[in-house]
Amino acid sequence: MDITPDSIIYWQWQWINLNATIVFSWLVMLILVLGSWLITRNLSIEPPLSRWQVALEIIVEQIRQQIRDASQQKADQFLPFIGTLFLFITMANLLTIFPVYQSPAGSLSTTAALALCVFVAVPIYGIKNVGITNYLRHYIQPTPVMLPFNLISEISRTVSLAIRLFGNIMSTSLLVAILISIVPLFFPAVMTLFGLLVGVIQAYVFTILAMVYIASGMNLQQRKTGNHHA
């Protein structure tokens, strides 16, 4: 039983290797790209709408609503980034119903890459909203002595994002595999559904936390104003 898809090597040449994490990450991206193209190529604003378009609109509206609730801001500016994160992680976990598939989210390299995307997105959105001077100034608030602590806080929450998703997906996969080997009859179907549920929940938690971090970087001006009033 492989703990992480990084340990499954399909091809190797010198220091270059093609492991399950890379292969299945490409597969997930291919499915999302092709699926998006197939669903959106015949979009219509006139009824009757296709079932695929109705399903797509429901998903997009739910993501938009969650973004609004988490950020208290207009959702459209965040929808491409947050929506992509959610759909990638969700699809990566849902495909575990296929026996040979290994979720890329079970690899620390994948979750670290996703967390790094969030780490980069936070200052981009923050600078866009409050300006580069105000954004950089918040690192030395309320005193310049706090600079190293604020930097550590930024890094630590990025690390926690990566480890949380990796740990939950990996531990769930191991638990399901162990229980299926012990009770090989009806139990596998139940545990597979449990694994899918956990995968969707973890995708939701990751993207909501990402949105909260981004929103916190954009609300610096409001916090500054609030401190002056206090």
UniProtKB/Swiss-Prot annotation:
Transmembrane segments: 20-40, 78-98, 112-132, 174-194, 195-215
Subcellular location as annotated: Cellular thylakoid membrane
Gene Ontology CC annotations of this record: plasma membrane-derived thylakoid membrane; proton-transporting ATP synthase complex
Entry keyword annotation includes Ion transport: yes
GO molecular function list: proton-transporting ATP synthase activity, rotational mechanism
Domain of life of the source: Bacteria
Membrane topology qualifier: Multi-pass membrane protein
Secretion signal span: none
Key words, A-Z: ATP synthesis, CF(0), Hydrogen ion transport, Ion transport, Membrane, Thylakoid, Transmembrane, Transmembrane helix, Transport
Pfam families: ATP-synt_A
Record carries keyword Ribonucleoprotein: no
Any one of the GO BP annotations: proton motive force-driven plasma membrane ATP synthesis
InterPro entries with a match to the protein in the record: Alt_ATP_synth_F0_Asu (IPR017692), ATP_syn_F0_a_bact/chloroplast (IPR045082), ATP_synth_F0_asu (IPR000568), ATP_synth_F0_asu_AS (IPR023011), F0_ATP_A_sf (IPR035908)
Record's function text: Key component of the proton channel; it plays a direct role in the translocation of protons across the membrane.
Protein family according to the UniProt entry: Belongs to the ATPase A chain family.
Assembly behavior: F-type ATPases have 2 components, CF(1) - the catalytic core - and CF(0) - the membrane proton channel. CF(1) has five subunits: alpha(3), beta(3), gamma(1), delta(1), epsilon(1). CF(0) has four main subunits: a, b, b' and c.
NCBIfam families in alphabetical order: altF1_A, ATP_synt_6_or_A, PRK05815.2-3
Protein name: ATP synthase subunit a 1
